[in-house]
């Protein structure tokens, strides 16, 4: 994709300057499609990249177009200060922000498309102690687990129906991580984790057996249990 760019002396010069990290480089005269191609070429090989624009609408447009170049691109929208806490369940904005933060915490390559407003919002990344990790054969205390999940922003329910909820009944723990398409089901024998699997929310049927899982907070800041 960047072979044609490499033939341009100007591109080679700009790439060298940007890799030196000395000051700001300003480019002009490119149409939108050329801008994204240039961004991809100049940042090729970098593990972390951030594309900042002026509005969520423009960020969404860039995100959709940039997916052609980079499968690791993710959208990080700004908070809606009025409606942000109104309904955590199924909230696309919250899910997109949490998924992006998760990828950063996991240290995976990512290109983040965001806005000035989103960057200006104070944000604290989670620490290892803010995350729940468990595996088959490990141990879990139901009472302590429930307290931690509530502290992480999860809502306790009789039966899990939407992302951000969890339930504990009869040695079975269901958790619907906000960043996953399907919830997890953990079966306990006493405090021993006997099995872990993902399951379908409607049919309740198992989808995949899992060796281990990582559960991330639903909220950005939370009380630590």
Enumerate the predicted regions with their spans:
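ASCE RecA-like P-loop NTPase motor cores
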Residues: 1-224
């Amino acid at each position: 994709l960047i072979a044609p760019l490499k033939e341009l002396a100007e591109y080679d010069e700009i790439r060298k300057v940007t890799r030196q990290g000395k000051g700001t480089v300003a480019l002009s005269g490119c149409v939108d499609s050329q801008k994204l191609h240039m961004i991809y070429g100049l940042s090729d090989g970098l593990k972390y990249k951030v594309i900042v624009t002026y509005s969520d609408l423009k960020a969404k447009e860039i995100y959709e177009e940039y997916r052609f170049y980079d499968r690791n691109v993710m959208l990080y929208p700004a908070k809606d200060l009025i409606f942000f806490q109104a309904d955590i369940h199924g909230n696309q904005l919250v899910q997109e922000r949490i998924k992006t933060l998760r990828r950063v915490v996991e240290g995976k390559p990512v290109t983040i498309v965001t806005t000035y407003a989103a960057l200006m919002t104070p944000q604290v990344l989670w620490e290892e102690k803010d995350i729940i990790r468990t595996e088959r054969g490990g141990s879990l205390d139901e009472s302590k687990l429930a307290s931690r999940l509530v502290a992480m922003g999860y809502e306790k329910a009789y039966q899990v129906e939407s992302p951000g909820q969890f339930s504990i009944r009869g040695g079975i723990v269901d958790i619907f991580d906000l960043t996953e398409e399907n919830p997890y089901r953990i079966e306990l024998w006493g405090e021993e984790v006997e099995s872990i699997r993902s399951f379908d929310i409607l049919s309740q049927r198992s989808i995949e057996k899992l060796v281990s899982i990582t559960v991330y907070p639903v909220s950005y800041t939370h009380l630590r249990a």
